[in-house]
UniProtKB/Swiss-Prot annotation:
GO terms for cellular component: centrosome; cytoplasm; nucleoplasm; nucleus; spindle pole. It comes from Mus musculus. GO terms for molecular function: ATP binding; metal ion binding; molecular function activator activity; protein serine kinase activity; protein serine/threonine kinase activity. This is Serine/threonine-protein kinase Nek7. Coiled coil: none annotated. The keyword Acetylation applies. The gene is Nek7. Protein kinase which plays an important role in mitotic cell cycle progression. Required for microtubule nucleation activity of the centrosome, robust mitotic spindle formation and cytokinesis. Phosphorylates EML4 at 'Ser-146', promoting its dissociation from microtubules during mitosis which is required for efficient chromosome congression. Phosphorylates RPS6KB1. Acts as an essential activator of the NLRP3 inflammasome assembly independently of its kinase activity. Belongs to the protein kinase superfamily. NEK Ser/Thr protein kinase family. NIMA subfamily. Binding to NEK9 stimulates its activity by releasing the autoinhibitory function of Tyr-97.
Length: 302
């Protein structure tokens, strides 16, 4: 459910202005208590609006999902159960899930507003300037991302959709990992219809073989993201590439090496062990986080 916020900064939305009486007893659990201001993003299955709570003035992101059209009853129940899990996460580098409720035949999810750019925008900026991201900057952001994922995995929650567009960076340089992958709850028929939207460069070999997603699949995506921060493109990116040739490249771990004259052996080695076709041979998040902390400490002073 990636959110494409670029080009979505439209005029203020008026048709969603609450007309119902305020319900202080309901808190964040009803649309009546929100003023919706403008659309800020759109995903395959959802639209995201900037809104503010009329009870406390807090700005939020309100994600509206067409839940009844896109899910069967079991998937709806599983999705809501998963969101309840996400609400238990509490970490400075994870977008906070405040509330979720079904109203007007839609699933409404109230999230912390990430009023910031994202990592994909930062990568595009460096690419446009024909400059590589300094290694100390890579570790500054990557260590925060590892901290977020360590928190999630310690609570047995997988992200499932780690990629630069889902990593937000605030004006003060704080990383916020957002848009946790709830897409698996949508019907296979619906998902198939959307499978050509965006090339799945971060898809792990086990996903290709439909062997299911596990915690080590998040590590694969994390390795791809670290590579992309250094190379300014996905490890498996190729011009005019179809899905078949992409899957072949992923299965064979066929990607160009990072420049050794610009990035440390430690960074290149970490990428290599994360992007391993065998999930069992990939490290866990605790190991990746330890390396990131050590490298952040020794590059921050340079």
């Amino acid at each position: 459910m990636d959110e494409q916020s670029q080009g979505m900064q439209g005029p203020p939305v008026t048709q969603f202005q609450p007309q119902k009486a305020l319900r202080p007893d309901m808190g964040y659990n009803t649309l009546a208590n929100f003023r919706i201001e403008k659309k800020i993003g759109r995903g395959q299955f959802s639209e995201v609006y900037r809104a503010s709570c009329l009870l406390d003035g807090v700005p939020v992101a309100l994600k509206k999902v067409q839940i009844f059209d896109l899910m069967d009853a079991k998937a709806r129940a599983d999705c809501i159960k998963e969101i309840d899990l996400l609400k238990q996460l509490n970490h400075p580098n994870v977008i906070k899930y405040y509330a979720s409720f079904i109203e007007d035949n839609e699933l409404n999810i109230v999230l912390e507003l990430a009023d910031a750019g994202d990592l994909s925008r930062m990568i595009k900026h460096f690419k446009k300037q024909k400059r590589l991201i300094p290694e100390r900057t890579v570790w500054k952001y990557f260590v925060q991302l590892c901290s977020a994922l360590d928190h999630m995995h310690s609570r047995r929650v997988m992200h499932r959709d780690i990629k630069p567009a889902n990593v937000f960076i605030t004006a003060t340089g704080v990383v916020k990992l957002g848009d946790l992958g709830l897409g698996r709850f949508f019907s296979s028929k619906t998902t198939a219809a959307h499978s050509l939207v965006g090339t799945p460069y971060y898809m792990s070999p086990e996903r290709i073989h439909e062997n299911g997603y596990n915690f080590k699949s998040d590590i694969w995506s994390l390795g791809c993201l670290l590579y992309e921060m250094a190379a300014l493109q996905s490890p498996f990116y190729g011009d005019k590439m179809n899905l078949y040739s992409l899957c072949k490249k992923i299965e064979q771990c066929d990607y160009p090496p990072l420049p050794s004259d610009h990035y440390s052996e430690e960074l290149r080695q970490l990428v290599n062990i994360c992007i391993n076709p065998d999930p069992e041979k990939r490290p866990d998040i605790a190991y990746v986080y330890d390396v990131a902390k050590r490298m952040h400490a020794c590059t921050a002073s340079t």
